[in-house]
A protein has these predicted regions:
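Residues at beta-strand starts and edge strands
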Residues: 6, 91, 104-107, 177-181
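Non-cytosolic coordination micro-motifs
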Residues: 20-73, 108-197
Length: 197
């Protein structure tokens, strides 16, 4: 019995040593922590990496979805309607760009559903969130000024927490073709152009 007790203590001390080593890996900068952050980082949408140039993004999106429905003349936005991504058929998709005078950077992507009722918008928001939540393990839940729940999750591709993406419902100030709400996932905007003195 004494040998069994000593063997049990030995096993516990070995496991305790492994647990201690493992917990060090979860500290900021540790191996497990870095792997976890990498999985939480929003790196791309629809096959286009955030930070890609307008020209690169346009070519990738044209190969995937065909000609855009709308190209802004200043080349800051590309819009598609009724396209699928991640198994979801969105009524609207936009890819937005930031410019520094010499270069362009894809810094935002919005995908969503135009909805006629608040209930429809909540259902679409929940469907988007269920899909996104399966990949991102940390999030915050809030309620906006219109009483709609919204979720924030993910990490910016520029580093740091927060501002990865938001899943929410936007109540339109004026109905648009009978639609009063927009349920969306919005990645960014990420600030690629740093202008400091």
């Amino acid at each position: 019995m004494k040998k069994l007790f000593i063997l049990g203590l030995l096993c516990l001390s070995v496991l305790g040593g492994y647990a201690q080593d493992d917990s060090d890996d979860w500290k900021v900068g540790g191996k497990h922590y870095q792997e976890w952050v990498a999985k939480q980082t929003c790196t791309e949408a629809c096959g286009v990496r955030f930070g890609s140039s307008y020209e690169t993004a346009k070519e990738i999106l044209k190969r995937k979805y065909g000609e855009p429905d709308y190209l802004e003349t200043n080349e800051n936005i590309i819009v598609y309607h009724y396209k699928s991504y991640g198994g979801m058929n969105f009524t609207y998709m936009s890819f937005n760009f930031q410019r520094d005078g010499a270069h362009s950077y894809m810094n935002q992507c919005v995908m969503g559903y135009e909805c006629k009722t608040a209930e429809e918008a909540k259902d679409k928001r929940d469907a988007i969130w269920t899909k996104a939540r399966s990949k991102y393990t940390a999030w915050s839940e809030y309620v906006d000024e219109n009483g709609f729940k919204y979720y924030e999750s993910g990490c910016s591709p520029l580093g740091g927490f927060g501002n990865g993406f938001i899943v929410d419902v936007v109540k339109l100030s004026e109905p648009y073709n009978g639609y009063r709400y927009f349920a969306r996932i919005m990645y960014g905007p990420y600030n690629y152009v740093q202008e400091d003195f």
